[in-house]
């Protein structure tokens, strides 16, 4: 038994407390206290449902020098995540039931965050032959995606949506037009021209989202079941507007935004620092503000990290050669708690929802509200500020564009089904 005393509760329904939360048998037993072997003082902290990340690259199999299941899932629980969706662009790609099953079994044995693998939409992520969606789902896959690559063949995407629809599986897309994106390393515009760097235009994202929404319309018309499209790492104002219009028209589309697109802009590239090189690229301030509005009005369903670890040597290469990607599992919530809630008054209830019930809805999972009988997959968050220090990361990627930023809202206790998987109590 664990008793968390004098703690505020925050979930998608709102805030309440302070209360005394008794945990046992993997569930919340009482909100009125009780006898417990371990007592945690929650004074000044708040308790939330465990977070779910829809989009993380754990690099296993094939690139364990960058990250592996242990380091990635340990980073996850240190970031307050009890559940995580791993992307399939590994080496080899996760495109068979056997590969999905192997990941699930290894992750379960580690006893950290619960892993929910995404499987490739097409064999080897080559964009040609569809993978066996039903068998992948039986093995544990929760969505289909060729993330890391773009879906260039609209016919293949349509067939994938039609295949996934009766299974209730969402199809997630990395929405960039490869012909427009070309070799861009930062947002296309005056700053890229000034710096002499190849640009990736915002129209590359908007054009691909527009096409994919038309493909979704086609699949919706042709399928007796409901196809579900999920747009990954939205980065532009126009892309957001397209998703907003589609939702208002009743299309079954969901979308996510990342911590880096919500807190950073292309201005960070003035230093030519590859730490800020990410795909899609950091955009302008107008795009960032549009994303924040999308969080509030429901256009964006979830905040997803797109955690993308690389080796230190790779990220120290010059900007043109360094790989795309930012590691963020361990700082995502503190970053947005500080930058959005504390500094801008973004509602805490809504912020927590974007880390919990929002991503759960994308996967078709029920909400986790804090009440008696609820599964005790929880995170205790401390508002006390401390600086970001990537040298203390559990992730193998011990670098960060937010190094030195003073943030509050750090996870100090993470539980999965009542088991403590991370503890950093003072």
From Swiss-Prot:
Indicate what this protein is called per its UniProt record.
Answer: Dihydroorotase
This protein's UniProt keywords: Hydrolase, Metal-binding, Pyrimidine biosynthesis, Zinc
Give me the residues that bind Zn(2+) 2, please. 147, 174, 233
List each coiled-coil range: none
Tell me the cofactor note. Answer: Binds 2 Zn(2+) ions per subunit.
Q: Which cofactor does it need?
A: Zn(2+)
Q: Which SUPFAM superfamilies match?
A: Composite domain of metallo-dependent hydrolases, Metallo-dependent hydrolases
EC number, as in UniProt? 3.5.2.3
Tagged with keyword Metal-binding: yes
Transmembrane regions listed in the UniProt entry:
none
User: Which residues are involved in binding substrate?
Assistant: 57-59, 89, 310, 324-325
Q: Kindly identify the residues recorded as the active site.
A: 306
Tagged with keyword Transmembrane helix: no
- Top-rank taxon, per record: Bacteria
Entry similarity comment: Belongs to the metallo-dependent hydrolases superfamily. DHOase family. Class I DHOase subfamily.
- Matching Pfam families: Amidohydro_1
Annotated pathway: Pyrimidine metabolism; UMP biosynthesis via de novo pathway; (S)-dihydroorotate from bicarbonate: step 3/3
Example GO molecular function term? Answer: allantoinase activity
Q: Which species does this protein come from?
A: Thermus aquaticus
Q: Per its database record, what is this protein's job?
A: Catalyzes the reversible cyclization of carbamoyl aspartate to dihydroorotate.
